[in-house]
């Protein structure tokens, strides 16, 4: 479960947590406590299965721990506190893997040569609203959602359209990112073209790769 040990003292704070975002988490805790980042002594513990859940731009459970520690200290109490999110807490306050819809219209000849490939993806952005938006979202397109298609190693004339709907479901990254859905779609479609043109799928892929 998400958890940490926090000890707020007169001269700073000690924090023990399995973090994947130490610098951001340290700064978030410092901000809540009114400290400088260097006053937060961060001890990184073994994270177990982090899978990106312990790399949250909002530093959610650690910021919460800092708020609790601040109130605990203000009440006159001293000593370390351990904060643990239950499974119910995590489901209620966590983030979800966004759903994606792919639609492709492909034109190819009898030999399997692709003449046109129109590809549309619809899905929530996991980068918009995070500190990474400035360099990972260009012209309104989340780069993490198009990887595996815009940079496909296959010689394909792909025309890609992306739509990011705004929904109230909180989403963020998961184990791996865009390739988890784009690779499945691309490879499935390549298989379909190979089968429709009567070619061995491996040989067809080798032809699409050219000299790569």
Report each predicted region and the residues it spans.
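Glycine-rich loop/linker segments at domain edges
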Residues: 1-4, 101-188
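Short acidic, glycine/serine/threonine-rich loops at helix termini
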Residues: 26-28, 51-57, 92-98, 118-120, ...
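A residue-level signal for beta-strand positions that form part of recognition/binding surfaces
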Residues: 12, 80, 153
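Short amphipathic alpha-helical surface micro-motifs
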Residues: 24, 62, 85-88, 97-99, ...
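Alpha-helical support elements that line or immediately flank enzyme active sites
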Residues: 4-75, 134-148, 173-212
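Phosphate/diphosphate-binding loops
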Residues: 63, 70-126
């Amino acid at each position: 479960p998400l958890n940490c040990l926090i000890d707020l003292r007169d001269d700073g704070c000690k924090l023990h947590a399995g973090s994947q975002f130490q610098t951001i988490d340290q700064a978030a805790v410092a901000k809540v406590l009114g400290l400088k980042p260097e006053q937060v002594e961060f001890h990184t513990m073994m994270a177990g299965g982090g899978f990106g859940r312990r790399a949250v731009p909002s530093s959610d459970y650690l910021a919460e721990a800092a708020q609790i520690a601040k109130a605990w200290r203000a009440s006159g109490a001293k000593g370390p506190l351990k904060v643990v999110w239950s499974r119910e807490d995590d489901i209620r306050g966590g983030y979800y893997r966004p759903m994606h819809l792919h639609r492709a219209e492909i034109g190819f000849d009898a030999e399997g040569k692709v003449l046109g490939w129109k590809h549309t993806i619809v899905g929530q952005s996991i980068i918009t609203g995070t500190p990474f938006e400035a360099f990972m979202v260009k012209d309104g397109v989340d780069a993490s959602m198009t990887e595996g298609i815009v940079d496909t190693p296959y010689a394909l004339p792909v025309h890609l359209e992306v739509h990011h709907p705004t929904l109230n479901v909180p989403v963020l990254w998961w184990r791996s990112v865009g390739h988890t859905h784009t690779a499945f779609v691309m490879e499935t479609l390549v298989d379909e073209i190979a089968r429709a043109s009567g070619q061995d799928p491996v040989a067809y892929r080798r032809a699409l790769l050219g000299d790569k």
